[in-house]
């Protein structure tokens, strides 16, 4: 004979399972449907900065250039003060020409031309 307590326990477990299934399906459905391999960064070019383009357009350099990493040659490792097994090279999308402008009392740079060059944040000052 099945008691009422056993039946209630089964109903609670089924309810929790259905609720969990609902949340998982909802999360899967809200995830963007795209192929992650096609998310390559665009070519280095001027792009409209929507945050600062209120009364007039403000452009910033956006996009990718190239980067690569490879094993450091043994001869180079021996000459390093702090040996590193991996060497990396990178070029970033930076402004070739720009000028300062004010947007709501904030000084920003409006880029006029972009190119691939040394990444500033990799440089030692």
UniProtKB/Swiss-Prot annotation:
GO cellular component: extracellular space; follicle-stimulating hormone complex
GO biological process, one term: thyroid hormone generation
Pfam families in the cross-refs: Hormone_6
Signal sequence interval, chain numbering: 1-30
GO terms of molecular function: follicle-stimulating hormone activity
Subcellular location: Secreted
Chain positions carrying an annotated carbohydrate: 85, 110
Keywords, alphabetical: Disulfide bond, Glycoprotein, Hormone, Secreted, Signal
Disulfide cross-links: 41-64, 44-93, 61-114, 65-116, 92-119
Subcellular location, principal: secreted
Keyword Metal-binding: no
Family that this chain belongs to: Belongs to the glycoprotein hormones subunit alpha family.
Subunit text: Heterodimer. Glycoprotein hormones are heterodimers composed of a common alpha chain described here and a unique beta chain which confers their biological specificity to the different hormones.
Functional description taken from the UniProt entry: Shared alpha chain of heterodimeric glycoprotein hormones. These hormones bind specific receptors on target cells that in turn activate downstream signaling pathways. Involved in gametogenesis and steroidogenesis.
Name of the protein in question: Glycoprotein hormones alpha chain
Organismal lineage: Eukaryota, Metazoa, Chordata, Craniata, Vertebrata
Encoding gene, per UniProt annotation: cga
């Amino acid at each position: 004979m099945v008691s009422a307590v056993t039946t209630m326990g089964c109903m609670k477990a089924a309810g929790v399972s259905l609720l969990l299934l609902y949340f998982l399906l909802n999360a899967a459905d809200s995830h963007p449907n795209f192929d992650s391999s096609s998310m390559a960064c665009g070519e280095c070019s001027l792009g409209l900065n929507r945050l600062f383009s209120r009364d007039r357009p403000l452009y910033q350099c956006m996009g990718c250039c190239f980067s690569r990493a490879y094993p450091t040659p043994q001869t180079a490792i021996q000459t390093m003060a702090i040996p590193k097994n991996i060497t990396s090279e990178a070029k970033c999308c930076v402004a070739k020409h720009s000028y300062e402008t004010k947007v709501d009392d904030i000084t920003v740079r409006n880029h006029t031309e972009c190119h691939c060059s040394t990444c500033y944040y990799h440089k030692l000052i």
